[in-house]
C-alpha cells in the first residue's frame, strides 16, 4: 500500500533519527509527504492543541530547544518535510487532531524498550486512539 502523508511522532531523543530514516525509506518510492510532530505531555494544563512551528507568533510558545531539535531533524532528513508541528496535552488527541487536519494516513512512532515504557507506554495509548495505520519502531537507547 502506498501512503500519501506520513506523520512521524518524535520525542526528540537521539533515536528520533531512526524514525525519520524509516519514514523516508517508506515515503521516497511513492513521493509521499512527511510531517514531524512533537507533543509535550508535561504542559497539558497550559495549552491543548497544535502549533505550527512556521507561524512567527506561535514560535514563542515553543521552547527554543524543541524548535531547534525539530528544525535539525527536518533539515537532516534528506527528504522534504511538509509540516513541522509541536503540540501540548494529551498525546493521542493531539495526534488525532493533526491526522484530521493534514489528512495523514500513517503514523510512525517509536517504542523505547526500557523499564518505564513497560509501565507507561505511549505506543499503547496511540494504538487505542489513532484510527490510521501505525508503524511502531522498537528503539534502544544509544548506550545499550
Curated annotation (Swiss-Prot):
Keyword set, alphabetical order: Cytoplasm
Pfam families (UniProt xref): Usp (PF00582)
Coiled-coil residue windows: none
Main location: cytoplasm
Gene3D superfamilies, per the entry: HUPs
CDD domains: USP-A-like
SUPFAM superfamilies cross-referenced by the UniProt entry: Adenine nucleotide alpha hydrolases-like
Presence of the UniProt keyword Phosphoprotein in the record: no
Localization annotation: Cytoplasm
One of the GO BP terms on file: response to stress
Complex formation: Homodimer.
Family per record: Belongs to the universal stress protein A family.
The protein, known as: Universal stress protein A
This protein's encoding gene: uspA
Amino acid at each position: 500500500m502506498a501512503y500519501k502523508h506520513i506523520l512521524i511522532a518524535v520525542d526528540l531523543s537521539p533515536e528520533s533519527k531512526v524514525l525519520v530514516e524509516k519514514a523516508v525509506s517508506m515515503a521516497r518510492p511513492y513521493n509521499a509527504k512527511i510531517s514531524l510532530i512533537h507533543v509535550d505531555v508535561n504542559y497539558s494544563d497550559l495549552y491543548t492543541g497544535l502549533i505550527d512551528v512556521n507561524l512567527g507568533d506561535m514560535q514563542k510558545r515553543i521552547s527554543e530547544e524543541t524548535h531547534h531539535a525539530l528544525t535539525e531533524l527536518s533539515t537532516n532528513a534528506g527528504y522534504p518535510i511538509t509540516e513541522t508541528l509541536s503540540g501540548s496535552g494529551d498525546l493521542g488527541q493531539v495526534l488525532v487532531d493533526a491526522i484530521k487536519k493534514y489528512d495523514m494516513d500513517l503514523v510512525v512512532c517509536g517504542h523505547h524498550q526500557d523499564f518505564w515504557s513497560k509501565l507507561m507506554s505511549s505506543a499503547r495509548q496511540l494504538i487505542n486512539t489513532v484510527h490510521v495505520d501505525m508503524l511502531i519502531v522498537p528503539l534502544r537507547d544509544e548506550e545499550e
